[in-house]
Design a protein with these regions (language model features):
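C-terminal segment of classical bacterial N-terminal signal peptides
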Residues: 13-22
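Transmembrane beta-barrel architecture of outer-membrane proteins
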Residues: 34, 85-90, 124-127, 173-177, ...
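Outer membrane beta-barrel
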Residues: 26-57, 68-69, 74-199, 214-217, ...
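Extracellular loop and loop/strand-boundary signature of outer-membrane beta-barrel proteins
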Residues: 76-79, 114-116, 161-166, 202-210, ...
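Outer-membrane beta-barrel proteins
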Residues: 48-52, 118-121, 155-158, 198-203, ...
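Outer-membrane beta-barrel "beta-signal"
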Residues: 421-437
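Detector for outer-membrane/organellar transmembrane beta-barrel domains
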Residues: 227-375, 379
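Positively charged n-region of N-terminal signal peptides that target proteins for export
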Residues: 1-4
Length: 437
């Protein structure tokens, strides 16, 4: 027994000595957790002058529906409407306090009630990520973000009070990702891999993550930012590679059974540029995206099937579009805001061989599920007034969104609706009461 006690004492002494030596090499260890809850209660009242395409409870607004004339000559989509909702109420938690030498860890968990299950609002995950930061390399910072967070193409938002925050003129997406950044001086380089979850690319089976899952290539983003006290400039690009078919769903050419592996693939790149200026109570920003596809970013786009001669290797072309916005905000207690957005469909970069057909078959186009294949261009203006009384905000916003539609059955060899062009307008008025926690 005495021998065991002596051995234990010797081991304890060795551990204490090694721990003391180790503590001399580590500058600081801090395991204190700091939890900072945040969020807001938000109630919205909305008037629309006509039926429109919008997300849950008509809060996330996209565009007015095209005219649909009945036998009496009336437009059945001309239906003014009014509604109220509070499902965008949000809860979040910031976690900080873990530091180990020059290495620190923080995190975020955020959710809202913007998920309708029948007529019941349910909790929906928005963000859940961990940030790893190394900050003791002279003026250079290195960071890694892992988890679900804002897509880098979407992170810079226009100044407005609506739920869609500029979409579909501004990308809107948060997804699981691993994003690395390195900052030296005023410059930051960012790159990483992204996987679609809530905001999905489209294809023959509708919106699905499977086009990336079975394609074995993650979505990739890379960008560079320059920041000063009053100015921010950012350029970046999103790359996504899809397999519209990874196996056959039917017997092909009489020789290939159901489940035969296919070589289909389409890869698309969407570059982006962003500018922001801040001076006192005045803020202004602008963004433009030249999107190939872009439907997973809630932009009006997709791609088209162009050739099926090889039953195991269908050919596709991306639909190109240009989407931009400019916005401003002035004031603190009494705040004036405004956004102007414009989108133009540019079609395919190459002409499609139509063969004996006169126009492209719309069934061969895989398009954003909340848009329409015969859109030529869109525009939006949203003047906004807000009064901020401490944590309480009263806001009212007017939204005028216009869409130029064309004949869906007259798509040319670039997939553009060239006939019967006409503009449809919707006038939306939104009132918001918001209380920040």
């Amino acid at each position: 027994m005495k021998r065991l006690i002596m051995i234990a004492m010797a081991l304890s002494a060795m551990l204490l000595q090694s721990t003391g030596g180790f503590s001399q090499t580590v500058k600081n260890v801090n395991l204190t957790q700091h939890l900072q809850p945040y969020g807001f209660f938000r109630t919205s009242a909305i008037f629309d002058s006509r039926d429109s395409k919008a997300g849950s409870e008509d809060l996330f607004y996209y565009l007015p529906l095209d005219k649909s004339i009945n036998l009496n000559g009336a437009d059945v989509n001309y239906n003014p409407s009014f509604k109220m909702s509070a499902i965008t109420t949000r809860l979040g938690l910031n976690v900080t306090g873990f530091r180990y030498g020059d290495f620190s860890v923080s995190g975020k968990l955020e959710a809202d009630f913007y998920l309708m299950v029948g007529s019941t609002a349910s909790l929906r995950l928005r963000e859940a990520y961990v940030d790893l930061l190394w900050d003791d390399y002279s003026s250079t910072l290195f960071s890694i973000r892992a988890g679900q967070a804002w897509h880098p193409m979407s992170a810079d938002l226009p100044y407005c009070i609506n739920v869609e925050t500029g979409s579909p003129f501004n990308p809107f997406n948060w997804s699981p990702q691993v994003m690395a950044g390195i900052t030296f001086g005023n410059w930051t380089l960012t790159a990483g891999a992204i996987y679609p979850m809530q905001f999905l690319p489209t294809g023959p089976s509708g919106p699905s993550e499977n086009y990336v899952k079975y394609g074995l290539i993650p979505e990739i983003y890379a960008g560079v930012s320059f920041r000063t006290d009053v100015f921010l400039a950012r350029v970046g690009a999103d790359f996504i590679s899809l397999k519209p078919r990874w196996r056959s769903e039917e017997i092909l050419a009489g020789s290939y059974d159901v489940g035969t592996k296919t070589g289909d693939r389409i890869s698309m790149v969407s570059p982006m540029a962003y500018l922001q200026f801040t001076s006192g109570a005045f803020k202004m920003n602008a963004k433009t995206v030249l999107a190939q596809g872009g439907d997973h970013l809630r932009l009006m786009g997709g791609y088209v099937l162009t050739n099926i001669d090889d039953p195991l290797n269908y050919q596709y072309l991306p639909l190109v579009s240009s989407s931009s916005f400019v916005s401003f905000s002035y004031g603190r207690r009494f705040q004036i805001m405004g956004m102007a957005g414009y989108m133009r469909a540019l079609g395919t970069n190459h002409m499609i061989n139509l063969g004996d057909a006169s126009y492209v078959n719309p069934d061969n186009i895989y398009y954003f599920s909340d848009g329409f294949k015969n859109i030529n261009q869109m525009f939006r203006a949203t003047p906004t007034l807000a009064y901020n009384l401490g944590k309480l905000t009263f806001g009212i916003e007017y939204d005028c969104t216009g869409v130029e539609y064309g004949d869906i059955n007259s798509l040319d060899n670039h997939c553009l609706a060239i006939k019967d062009r006409h503009i449809i307008l919707n006038h939306r008025v939104m009132g918001v009461l918001k209380y920040n926690l």
